[in-house]
Amino acid sequence: MRLSLLILRQSRAKKEVTFSSVLVLVRLPEHSGLGEIITMFRHLRNLQQVSRRTLSSTARRQLENKVPVKQKMFQEDNGMPVHLKGGTTDALLYRATMALTVFGCGYVLYALIDAALPKKKA
Amino acid sequence: MAHQAHAYHMVDPSPWPLTGAIAALLMTSGLAIWFHFHSTTLMTLGLILLLLTMYQWWRDIIREGTFQGHHTPPVQKGLRYGMILFITSEVFFFLGFFWAFYHSSLAPTPELGGCWPPTGITPLDPFEVPLLNTAVLLASGVTVTWAHHSIMEGERKQAIQSLALTILLGLYFTALQAMEYYEAPFTIADGVYGSTFFVATGFHGLHVIIGSTFLAVCLLRQIQYHFTSEHHFGFEAAAWYWHFVDVVWLFLYVSIYWWGS
């Protein structure tokens, strides 16, 4: 297996989360010559540019400040308590937690009473 | 929507104190059932319930503070008192284990060979991994302070970087300590030396994990724009806790690792 270390440099554009240089460990096919290496390098550069465009646009979307939206949602005068005010997911999670709580209560009572009663050995 | 004529926070009715109490019941009873009947079901159920309770309770606190604006200055003052008192209680928790260590090590019994470390115990070299661990935690104290100043100065990117670095250092400490535990030439069953060593350092390690988790939550919140340069108490609480963890390690290092060898 032939391995080659390529150091790729990119220009740091404004408002993009990019690295100034990227270290890439590449596995080369056996018997690859200089021509193949250059082609592979070109492919990698293209891939980088595409991923950079994709990453930066999604990154910008992900890092948007959603606090004002949340503030509006949680300050809505709908009478809901804070633990259910987020929507359906809140209700599902609450029901699951309460179900486990009730079941757990019953199970612990059973387990402790069973542990407390002497068992006759057959 | 605000109908109150005061600055204090009258919380909405919440189910989490109940679910948390039941979780504690299930965990403790589950521990007893595990010891006597080899079944971990009850204890596992308790742990799941505990995790669910913690997630939802603290999620609600974030909603009340960041999204509903309930954390006014007097409320924040109360939260500060609360965190300080909690950390103080943790200090007393560790004081007990240090008391146990000094009780046994200052006057070693004839059963130990009348010496400390006891006969047959090869202690860890304090100038190897333990010293590295000390450097790691001290460095993390610097990075968390850097994060705090970055938040106060509105330097978003630096705050994220320094907070991430703090967490990485915490994880590095945990990994190193786990490796030390695996490689140690003595175990928890090796008399009072083993007991005091692993219980004290073990509880400390647990607190490092808790502190790292707290900081990780703060990192997520910082990324999501929850903190402002004036109001970021969640982060401050995490930073106080982290400094406490650091100081406990320093005492552990000097007492158990260094003097105790």
UniProtKB/Swiss-Prot annotation, chain B:
What enzyme category does the UniProt record give? translocase
In which broad location class does this protein mainly occur, judging by the first location in its UniProt entry? Answer: mitochondrion
Q: Which residues lie on this side of the membrane: Mitochondrial matrix?
A: 1-15, 67-72, 153-155, 224-232
How does the protein's chain sit in the membrane according to the entry? Multi-pass membrane protein
Compartment annotation: Mitochondrion inner membrane
Please state the Enzyme Commission number of this protein.
Answer: 7.1.1.9
Q: Which UniProt keywords apply?
A: Membrane, Mitochondrion, Mitochondrion inner membrane, Translocase, Transmembrane, Transmembrane helix
Mitochondrial intermembrane-facing ranges: 35-40, 106-128, 184-190, 257-261
So what does this thing catalyse? 4 Fe(II)-[cytochrome c] + O2 + 8 H(+)(in) = 4 Fe(III)-[cytochrome c] + 2 H2O + 4 H(+)(out)
Q: Which GO terms describe its cellular component?
A: mitochondrial inner membrane; respiratory chain complex IV
What are the GO BP annotations of this UniProt entry? mitochondrial electron transport, cytochrome c to oxygen
Entries under PROSITE patterns matching the protein:
COX3
Which Pfam families does the entry link to? COX3
Say what the protein does.
Component of the cytochrome c oxidase, the last enzyme in the mitochondrial electron transport chain which drives oxidative phosphorylation. The respiratory chain contains 3 multisubunit complexes succinate dehydrogenase (complex II, CII), ubiquinol-cytochrome c oxidoreductase (cytochrome b-c1 complex, complex III, CIII) and cytochrome c oxidase (complex IV, CIV), that cooperate to transfer electrons derived from NADH and succinate to molecular oxygen, creating an electrochemical gradient over the inner membrane that drives transmembrane transport and the ATP synthase.
Indicate the quaternary assembly.
Answer: Component of the cytochrome c oxidase (complex IV, CIV), a multisubunit enzyme composed of 14 subunits. The complex is composed of a catalytic core of 3 subunits MT-CO1, MT-CO2 and MT-CO3, encoded in the mitochondrial DNA, and 11 supernumerary subunits COX4I, COX5A, COX5B, COX6A, COX6B, COX6C, COX7A, COX7B, COX7C, COX8 and NDUFA4, which are encoded in the nuclear genome.
Q: Which family, according to UniProt?
A: Belongs to the cytochrome c oxidase subunit 3 family.
In Swiss-Prot or TrEMBL terms, this protein is called: Cytochrome c oxidase subunit 3
